[in-house]
Curated annotation (Swiss-Prot):
Record remark on domains: The KH domain is required for binding to RNA. The Pro-rich domains are flanked by Arg/Gly-rich motifs which can be asymmetric dimethylated on arginine residues to give the DMA/Gly-rich regions. Selective methylation on these motifs can modulate protein-protein interactions.
Protein name, per record: KH domain-containing, RNA-binding, signal transduction-associated protein 1
Sequence segments annotated as region (Involved in homodimerization): 100-260
Family membership noted in the UniProt record: Belongs to the KHDRBS family.
GO term, biological process aspect, one: G1/S transition of mitotic cell cycle
Keyword match Amino-acid biosynthesis: no
Lineage per the UniProt record: Eukaryota, Metazoa, Chordata, Craniata, Vertebrata
UniProt-reported outcome of changing residue 384 to K: Disrupts interaction with APC
Amino acid sequence: MQRRDDPAARMSRSSGRSGSMDPSGAHPSVRQTPSRQPPLPHRSRGGGGGSRGGARASPATQPPPLLPPSATGPDATVGGPAPTPLLPPSATASVKMEPENKYLPELMAEKDSLDPSFTHAMQLLTAEIEKIQKGDSKKDDEENYLDLFSHKNMKLKERVLIPVKQYPKFNFVGKILGPQGNTIKRLQEETGAKISVLGKGSMRDKAKEEELRKGGDPKYAHLNMDLHVFIEVFGPPCEAYALMAHAMEEVKKFLVPDMMDDICQEQFLELSYLNGVPEPSRGRGVPVRGRGAAPPPPPVPRGRGVGPPRGALVRGTPVRGAITRGATVTRGVPPPPTVRGAPAPRARTAGIQRIPLPPPPAPETYEEYGYDDTYAEQSYEGYEGYYSQSQGDSEYYDYGHGEVQDSYEAYGQDDWNGTRPSLKAPPARPVKGAYREHPYGRY
């Protein structure tokens, strides 16, 4: 009853009616508002009209900001909280940067409040702070591309694990470093990479290593890692990856737990040389048989029918191509001239009496082929003994007596001169005098 007599409500009701019947059409959306939004169930008619009328009656009210489509739904109310307006991208970027800006001071404060005894936590916080200050976190999120045609150098780093857990008794560090560090120096020169041994157990003095590990110096932070080989390569992309592959392949050879391989043997020789111990003879500097060195003289063969060794030249024996095959040579006597038309003497005849020869002299080291070694087995005295026995049967000798001419043809094929395909016995012709005493009297 008091609300009906309330003058404020009466004035708002009258102003609402006058506004709805205004022909100028200043508020054309008044009748459409109830159709879009249903009235609240617990709000009184008078109060609601007064609020709506008061909102329409204020001419200085500004229009609401643009709202997204999700804000104008059936759940949106007139008297509810104002929705958040749309923001430009720059504003959203500033909102995202706020957590990063707060993250760095929080890390700094946490590092200051942390006790220095927490070594690992201090190292992690320091690394994270440096990463944010340098902006590496943004670089990690971005995609990296390699420009193979640019000559810009890049840096590659790899850590190769040393299998000390599988082979705890093998000294990998000593094998990689070598005597006085010469092995790893040569390895760096061959591969073109920077190679170093890092990690737990890389230092010889264990007490000093433990002290440096507890010191917290970032320079010795690698002592908290496992034992490994650190390889660094700097160069253009293609060359850098090729050098890294070559360096890893060479380092792999040093990670084989074998004390008898070539690497360890060379290190032992180098260590003995550095210590002043003479190098053991391994075929160097000792006279051995090879190119340019004469072989040791073999023992002199003894016995009948044993020829000189290969490559030896017996003094007085014929050289290849010097005399006609079948002729005999006496020591120190040149071969006699041959008579034209005379048949070649036969070297081997059935029933030749062989006289044992004295042992040959000591052979000389001379590189020559011993094709004519068999001619030294018989001498001229054998022929004299043979024909001296047969002189009692016949007083003279005829070339055609008891012989066949074909035998000369068969033997002539082995002539050394090679001028005639065959040697035929000439026909018997008279010689000065009826006959000779001996067919080989010219000897």
